[in-house]
């Protein structure tokens, strides 16, 4: 955002009137500064608004059904803010005035909502007030269906807060009292406070420090979320009337802190306590969450009567031993999803894991999550009880430290679709010896770091090219310790269709024998390895292979003098997608790729520029891909792209990506050699202008992306002849304008014209504004992302905030001319007057300047009686004699009208007052406190008391009033004196031994007593005390 220049109020008035007139005519976007989206949604997010925008009467306000004001700075909501939106149904006000604990700078904020703010919107159905500093529930309309009051400061819910909300079905009040949003007490829900909400079905009260289940909840509830409170005891009466409950979440109330990723309170000993009949009356319950509850065992009575239970989350407990012998699953025949993740033993990794035989009773189970249990060997005994499950489709075993895995066991599962073994330590197939051993043998391991959990797979760089693994059977072995692949690993896995082996250390030369058992494999991911592609028959054992990812296998290609054979591509009859991205391929590879089936090739992140620099050796590298449709040549260090290079690309190409190269020139006429090309991506290059010719006629180009270049000029008619062009991206360039002549009649057919992030010149009457307004439906982010680059006052601001003062105005021009003429006249007159009567002006100036300090000093004399109080040791007769006969005479008698007023103890102190009263009055009635010292090694008595009062004055008034006069400079100086000499030298004066230096001493002493000490401080060390305003 550029610098802000505050406009004149009259200019703002004229600007507002002009904008209002334009809106009334329907020329500007209707909901400035917000953006209208489909289906009546108005987006006002992240605009730093301080009040709700009141849209113009010309805008179709009756069509607005959703208004989003997320992350603004609205602290006050008025009764009239939403009155004009007669059909508003959804209102989102998140993150406008967050509580102090949730604010990025921890500033306190309190949002004010007037009584009729929401009552004025009788159609409102969904209201989100989360992350705002509100302390009570505002008055709400009876039409409300969904209400979110999460992460606010509301700590009390009473029966009167929701009066009349008979249509309310969803209520969210999470995070009103927890470590990120601290509070003086837990959320208090009065008994029966929500009982009047007869249609409430979803209630969420997570993270509120609740210690018990709120009493007398509505019986209509089907979802109750109470996780991460402090409810450590559950009894039947807590959920007595909730017979319609379908989902219950009470996890995280008695936490397992060794696996917590945030502040955690240890679960008390012998807790939690769940009564055997706690859930027995919840006959409709389908989902139960008991995660992170410090459970060591499960009571069979807990699940009595839960015949409909389909989802059970038992993760992050201590059930590592219990799952090997439990019989609790015998009655859960309807269970579809079971989560047992992170039920590990502290600091222990088991050699084997044998699931209890009762798992075989889960005949409806579809998904089982067992990651983070920590066992080292996976054999047929481990999952034997699961092989009989007819519906099991997804099995998660990642992050278990498994180092030996018998993968063939998955062939016995009749319906298995996905097995996740990623993030383990598998180095090969389990041997018979590894399958034997003691069941309870264990190895100590260190505790997992907080928050460690399996993350998503790295996104493929060309995600549009490679298909996903949503197939019948997928096995994920990514992020393991595989170095070689043997066909024995995949015995009995002929049904496998997708195999992920990315992020291993596979460095062998694949020769066509590694994947022999996988006759049905269609997708193979070998990215992020070290594969040696030397054999011409690599992967030929996979006749149905359709997608092969060999990206990020750069190490073999970086080895000097080693050749690489890519001829295997021609021998894969079903291959359609191939990624060779980011391998640094530059030399000693097959001279030509051939395939009749390949449709998409990702060759980004290589060095095609070096390959094409070798004469004609690799000129036809891609020409043998006869049916190629998509080709990615991004990040190949291409500085030029000759017509012969394009001419030797497959003629079947429809999409060509050349992003992030170094192209400074592109021959647009050469696009005719690619007759079927529909999408061309040239983003992130170094194009300076679109001036060398124009897009040729007759091409099929529909999408052109030249964003993130440095284009500052486009010749007229450049896009005219590309009659099929419908999407054009010109964003993030150096364009000063958008000229309609670039497009001609094509402007009316463009569906997307992106010109955001260009430094547009917002001069008054700029033609591009009218053009963009005519095509505003096709311009994404017109109201917010299309901004000005000049003039400086408007830099970074929307093109619709144009300052009308920059328009040509005759009156303003005359005023500017007169002002400039006056400045020229002054520029001539001032030097002339200085030459003729400069001394007189100098004298008058300094006379006035001298008068001002005197006036200030006269005003100060009314409050300060003395210029300085003199403090010395009367016991030392020599010092007293010097003070009375030298110091007093010099400062009071010999300075004439500049004489100073000194306060001396024996002369000016009042009799009858105590010593301290006189001393305090003297110090606080004097401008300076002067200490006359014979030595500085140690002081006491009156000197010490006076020094402490001077320091007290420094703290109270922020004034340094200390002046030190040392009569014997050669004596030892204390550390304080030496430090003061370094910081404020002029306030420490030394009596000269030679009479010739006494005149200078008295002059410096007079300056030290009449000027403020803060002027004397050495600016290299400090600025000195500043006077409080």
UniProtKB/Swiss-Prot annotation:
UniProt entry tagged with the keyword DNA repair: no
Sequence ranges of the LRR repeats: 61-84, 86-109, 121-146, 149-165, 166-189, 197-220, 222-241, 242-267, 282-305, 307-331, 332-355, 362-385, 389-412, 414-439, 469-492, 494-517, 518-541, 543-570, 572-596, 598-620, 625-648, 650-673, 674-697, 699-721, 722-745, 747-770
The protein, known as: Toll-like receptor 9
Complexes and interactors: Monomer and homodimer. Exists as a monomer in the absence of unmethylated cytidine-phosphate-guanosine (CpG) ligand. Proteolytic processing of an insertion loop (Z-loop) is required for homodimerization upon binding to the unmethylated CpG ligand leading to its activation. Interacts with MYD88 via their respective TIR domains. Interacts with BTK. Interacts (via transmembrane domain) with UNC93B1. Interacts with CD300LH; the interaction may promote full activation of TLR9-triggered innate responses.
Disulfide-linked positions: 34-44, 97-109, 177-183, 254-267, 257-264, 469-498, 762-788, 764-807
Lipid addition sites, S-palmitoyl cysteine: 257, 264
Membrane found in the keyword field: yes
Annotated glycosylation sites: 63, 128, 199, 209, 241, 339, 380, 472, 511, 565, 667, 692, 729
Keywords: Cytoplasmic vesicle, Disulfide bond, Endoplasmic reticulum, Endosome, Glycoprotein, Immunity, Inflammatory response, Innate immunity, Leucine-rich repeat, Lipoprotein, Lysosome, Membrane, Palmitate, Receptor, Repeat, Signal, Transmembrane, Transmembrane helix
Residue intervals passing through the bilayer: 816-836
Primary localization class, coarse: endoplasmic reticulum
InterPro entries xref list: Leu-rich_rpt (IPR001611), Leu-rich_rpt_typical-subtyp (IPR003591), LRR_12 (IPR041283), LRR_dom_sf (IPR032675), TIR_dom (IPR000157), Toll_tir_struct_dom_sf (IPR035897)
Signal peptide start and end residues: 1-24
Name of a matching Pfam family: LRR_8
Ranges facing Extracellular side: 25-815
Gene Ontology cellular component annotations, sorted alphabetically: early phagosome; endolysosome; endoplasmic reticulum; endoplasmic reticulum membrane; endosome; lysosome; plasma membrane
Entry PTM: Activated by proteolytic cleavage of the flexible loop between repeats LRR14 and LRR15 within the ectodomain. Cleavage requires UNC93B1. Proteolytically processed by first removing the majority of the ectodomain by either asparagine endopeptidase (AEP) or a cathepsin followed by a trimming event that is solely cathepsin mediated and required for optimal receptor signaling. Palmitoylated by ZDHHC3 in the Golgi regulates TLR9 trafficking from the Golgi to endosomes. Depalmitoylation by PPT1 controls the release of TLR9 from UNC93B1 in endosomes.
A biological process from GO: positive regulation of MAPK cascade
Domain TIR: from-to ranges: 864-1009
Organism encoding this protein: Bos taurus (Bovine)
């Amino acid at each position: 955002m550029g610098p802000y220049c505050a406009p004149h109020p009259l200019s703002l008035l004229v600007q507002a009137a002009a904008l209002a007139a334009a809106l009334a005519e329907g020329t500007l976007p209707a909901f400035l500064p917000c953006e209208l989206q489909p289906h009546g949604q108005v987006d006002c997010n992240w605009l730093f608004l301080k009040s709700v925008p009141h849209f113009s009467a010309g805008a179709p306000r009756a069509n607005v059904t959703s208004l989003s004001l997320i992350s603004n700075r609205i602290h006050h909501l008025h009764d009239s803010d939403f009155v004009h939106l007669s059909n508003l149904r959804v209102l989102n006000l998140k993150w406008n005035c967050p509580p102090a604990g949730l604010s990025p700078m921890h500033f306190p904020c309190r949002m004010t909502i007037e009584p009729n703010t929401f009552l004025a919107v009788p159609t409102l159905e969904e209201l989100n007030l989360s992350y705002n500093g509100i302390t009570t529930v505002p008055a709400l309309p009876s039409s409300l269906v969904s209400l979110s009051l999460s992460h606010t400061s509301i700590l009390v819910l009473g029966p009167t807060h929701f009066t009349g909300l008979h249509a309310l079905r969803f209520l969210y009040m999470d995070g009103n009292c927890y470590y990120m949003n601290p509070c003086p007490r837990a959320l208090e829900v009065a008994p029966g406070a929500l009982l009047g909400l007869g249609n409430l079905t979803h209630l969420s009260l997570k993270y509120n420090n609740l210690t018990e289940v709120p009493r007398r909840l509505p019986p209509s509830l089907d979802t109750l979320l109470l996780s991460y409170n402090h409810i450590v005891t559950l009894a039947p009466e807590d959920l007595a009337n909730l017979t319609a409950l379908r989902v219950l979440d009470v996890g995280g109330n008695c936490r397992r802190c060794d696996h917590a990723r945030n502040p955690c309170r240890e679960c008390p000993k012998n807790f939690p306590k769940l009564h055997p009949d706690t859930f027995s009356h919840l006959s409709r319950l389908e989902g139960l969450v008991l995660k992170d509850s410090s459970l060591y065992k499960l009571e069979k009575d807990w699940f009595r009567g839960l015949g409909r239970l389909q989802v059970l989350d038992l993760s992050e407990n201590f059930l590592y031993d219990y799952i090997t012998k439990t019989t609790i699953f015998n009655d859960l025949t309807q269970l579809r999803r079971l989560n047992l993740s992170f039920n590990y033993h502290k600091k222990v990794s088991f050699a084997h894991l044998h699931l209890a035989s009762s798992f075989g009773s889960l005949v409806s189970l579809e998904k089982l999550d067992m990651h983070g249990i920590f066992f080292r060997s996976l054999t047929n005994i481990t999952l034997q009880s699961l092989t009989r499950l007819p519906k099991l489709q997804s099995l998660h075993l990642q992050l278990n430290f498994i180092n030996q895995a018998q993968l063939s066991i998955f062939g016995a599962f009749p319906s298995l679709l996905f097995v996740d073994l990623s993030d383990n330590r598998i180095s090969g197939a389990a041997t018979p010896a590894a399958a034997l051993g003691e069941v309870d043998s264990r190895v100590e391991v260190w505790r997992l770091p907080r928050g460690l959990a399996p993350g998503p797979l790295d996104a493929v760089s060309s995600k549009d090219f490679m298909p996903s693994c949503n197939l019948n059977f997928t096995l994920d072995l990514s992020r393991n310790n595989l170095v070689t692949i043997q066909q024995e690993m995949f015995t009995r896995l002929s049904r496998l269709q997708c195999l992920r082996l990315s992020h291993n250390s596979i460095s062998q030369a694949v020769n066509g024998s590694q994947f022999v058992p996988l006759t049905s494999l269609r997708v193979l991911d070998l990215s992020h390895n070290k594969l040696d592609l030397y054999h011409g028959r690599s992967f030929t054992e996979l006749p149905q292979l359709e997608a092969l990812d060999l990206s990020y296998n750069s190490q073999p290609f970086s080895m000097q003098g080693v050749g690489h054979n890519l001829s295997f591509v021609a021998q894969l009859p079903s291959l359609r997608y191939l990624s060779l991205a980011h391998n640094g391929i530059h030399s000693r590879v097959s001279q030509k790729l051939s395939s009749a089936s390949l449709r998409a090739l990702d060759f980004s992140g290589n060095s095609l520029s070096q390959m094409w620099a070798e004469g004609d050796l690799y000129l036809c590298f891609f020409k043998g891909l006869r049916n190629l449709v998509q080709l990615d040549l991004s990040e190949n260090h291409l500085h030029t792209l000759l017509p012969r290079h394009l001419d030797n690309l497959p003629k079947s190409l429809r999409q060509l990506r050349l992003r992030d190269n170094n192209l400074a020139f592109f021959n647009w006429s050469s696009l005719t050699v690619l007759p079927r090309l529909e999408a061309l991506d040239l983003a992130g290059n170094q194009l300076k202008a679109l001036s060398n010719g124009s897009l040729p006629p007759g091409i099929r180009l529909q999408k052109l992306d030249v964003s993130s270049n440095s284009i500052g000029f486009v010749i007229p008619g450049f896009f005219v002849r590309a009659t099929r062009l419908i999407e054009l991206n010109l964003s993030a360039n150096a364009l000063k304008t958008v000229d309609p002549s670039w497009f001609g009649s094509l402007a009316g057919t463009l569906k997307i014209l992106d010109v955001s992030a260009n430094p547009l010149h917002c001069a008054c009457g700029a033609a591009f504004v009218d053009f963009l307004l005519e095509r505003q439906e096709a311009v994404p982010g017109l109201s917010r992302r299309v901004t000005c680059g000049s003039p400086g006052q408007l830099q970074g601001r929307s093109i619709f905030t144009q300052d009308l003062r920059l328009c040509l105005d005759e009156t303003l021009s005359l005023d500017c001319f007169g002002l400039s003429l006056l400045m020229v006249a002054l520029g001539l007159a001032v030097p002339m007057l200085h030459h003729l009567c400069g001394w007189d002006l100098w004298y008058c100036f300094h006379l006035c300047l001298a008068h001002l300090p005197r006036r200030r000093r006269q005003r100060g004399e009314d409050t300060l009686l003395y210029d300085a109080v003199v403090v010395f040791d009367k016991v030392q007769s020599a010092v007293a004699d010097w003070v009375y006969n030298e110091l007093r005479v010099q400062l009071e008698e010999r300075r004439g009208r500049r004489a100073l007023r000194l306060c001396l103890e024996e002369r000016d102190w009042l009799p009858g007052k105590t010593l301290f009263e006189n001393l305090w009055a003297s110090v606080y009635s004097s401008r300076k406190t002067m200490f006359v010292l014979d030595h500085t090694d140690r002081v006491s008595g009156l000197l010490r008391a006076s020094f402490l009062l001077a320091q007290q004055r420094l703290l109270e008034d922020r004034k340094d009033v200390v002046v030190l006069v040392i009569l014997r400079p050669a004596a030892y100086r204390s550390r304080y004196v030496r430090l003061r000499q370094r910081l404020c030298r002029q306030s420490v004066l030394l009596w000269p031994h030679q009479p010739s230096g006494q005149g200078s001493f008295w002059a410096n002493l007079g300056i030290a007593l009449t000027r403020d000490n803060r002027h004397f401080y050495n600016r290299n060390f400090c600025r000195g005390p500043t006077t409080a305003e």
